């Protein structure tokens, strides 16, 4: 049976608590671990009269298991794991070292005094649906015709995933050369490692950038991939690594090195890239563009509807990927802010971001520090993080799943406050 579980912790070493729970779940009789999400931070659910000391943020994740255990046996096992990891029975909203909730048990609907499945809160809680949408976006839970991703988008509360940008290039538009010192990140750059995703690119796609061959690109990204593998060694709950490349050779080598996502700004124009992805289990970012590198003189007609163009383009390219055997749940669509759009068109796409959700694919925006902001600020790209944060807040409010940004720590600090005050 395929089982979905939600994990949460807001006491002690929260990430370690969840990792120990996952390891214990994987060790249950007749059980194997299939997929698990990255970590999302959320505010504690509290009653109005809860003590102030209960107000501790949670870390959350989702897990997919295959198990031969019966539902009540699995419930008993999860409760034993909670107890072993220090969970103390107390009042409903009190902090806890670990929560392990059985969200779905195959396609069964279960209602007993001990267990209700699907879990009663699964359809209304962002901290449950956001991690689930990362690993099983197209899954339909019993009792609903909507996918997990569609359910997530129906609730007002949003919980975006953060993607940190790692440009291992000497000429990127806002941070070129920052990661080249000793092939390792500086202390300040380590903040980029605290998100859900890390996107590593070895070729600049800024206007006027010069193409690089795959060997040069690989020499740039390989040391960072190796560093990250060592940095996260032994950790289950680690960011997923994305390789930002349009080279099939680089993509194949990165997949072999263990990346989880291939982010191709060319929109998988090279058939060889599609064949490589079809033979892998990686997710992929499908980005709209008119030219790579970006060309400010090559933009959509000023009198067109940019969303209509995007909907048509994504529809065609998703069909190409599906014919190649790539399931839609693996695809993340990116409208390509800065690639073939004027500033006005980019802002319109941001404002109408929800229209991109008709494809039932996760949506990513790479909007950080880009030229569309020039009409609102005169600072250089490397200083546009406050402006980027404002755009990120609006995209998150519109339900966009993944936000690709440079100043990850600034965004996370902002988001913690924004969640509490918006």
Feature map (PLM): residue ranges:
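Short acidic capping loops at alpha-helix termini that bridge into adjacent secondary structure
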Residues: 239, 328-330
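Active-site-adjacent loop and "lid" segments of alpha/beta metabolic enzymes
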Residues: 170-187, 205-230, 234, 240, ...
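N-terminal glycine-rich anion-binding loops that anchor highly charged ligand groups
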Residues: 162-164, 191-202
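Flexible, gly/pro- and Lys/Arg-enriched active-site loops
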Residues: 45, 49-59, 72-158
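Short, charge-patterned binding micro-sites
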Residues: 35-66, 202-212, 293
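Short beta-strand-to-loop capping motifs
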Residues: 9, 63-69, 104-107
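N-terminal beta1-alpha1 ligand-phosphate binding loop
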Residues: 1-44
């Amino acid at each position: 049976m395929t089982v979905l579980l939600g994990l949460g912790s807001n006491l002690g070493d929260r990430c370690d608590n969840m990792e120990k729970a996952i390891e214990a779940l994987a060790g249950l009789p007749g059980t194997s671990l299939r997929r698990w999400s990255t970590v999302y931070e959320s505010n504690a659910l509290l009653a109005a009269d809860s003590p102030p000391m209960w107000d501790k943020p949670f870390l959350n994740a989702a897990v997919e298991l295959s198990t031969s255990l019966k539902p009540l046996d699995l419930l008993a096992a999860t409760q034993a794991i909670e107890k072993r990891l220090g969970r103390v029975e107390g009042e409903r909203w009190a902090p806890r070292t670990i929560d392990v909730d059985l969200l779905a048990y195959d396609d069964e609907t279960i209602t007993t005094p001990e267990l209700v499945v699907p879990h009663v809160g699964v359809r209304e809680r962002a901290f449950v649906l956001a991690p689930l949408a990362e690993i099983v976006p197209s899954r339909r839970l019993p009792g609903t015709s909507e996918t997990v991703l569609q359910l997530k988008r129906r609730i007002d509360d949003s919980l975006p995933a953060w993607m940190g940008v790692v440009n291992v290039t000497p000429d990127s538009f806002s941070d070129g050369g920052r990661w080249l010192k000793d092939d390792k990140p500086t202390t300040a750059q380590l903040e980029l490692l605290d998100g859900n995703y890390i996107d590593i690119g070895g070729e600049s796609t800024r206007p006027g950038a010069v193409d690089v061959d795959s060997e040069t690109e690989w020499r740039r990204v390989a040391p960072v991939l190796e560093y990250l593998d060592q940095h996260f060694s032994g950790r289950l709950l680690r960011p997923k690594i994305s390789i930002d490349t349009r080279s099939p050779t680089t993509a194949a080598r990165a997949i072999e090195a263990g990346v989880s996502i291939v982010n191709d700004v060319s929109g998988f124009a090279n058939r060889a890239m599609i064949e490589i992805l079809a033979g892998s289990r990686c997710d992929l970012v499908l980005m709209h563009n008119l030219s790579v590198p970006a060309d400010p003189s090559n933009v959509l007609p000023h009198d067109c509807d940019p969303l209509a163009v995007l909907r048509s383009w994504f529809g065609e390219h998703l069909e190409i990927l599906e014919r190649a055997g790539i399931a839609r749940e693996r695809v993340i669509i990116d409208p390509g802010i800065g690639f073939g759009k004027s500033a006005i068109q980019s802002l319109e796409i941001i404002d109408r971001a929800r229209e991109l959700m008709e494809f039932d694919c996760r949506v990513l925006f790479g909007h950080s520090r880009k030229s569309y902001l020039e009409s609102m600020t005169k600072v250089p790209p490397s200083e546009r993080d406050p402006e980027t944060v404002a755009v990120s807040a609006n995209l998150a409010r519109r339900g966009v799943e993944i936000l690709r940004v440079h100043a990850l720590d600034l965004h996370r600090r902002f988001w913690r406050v924004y969640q509490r005050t918006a």
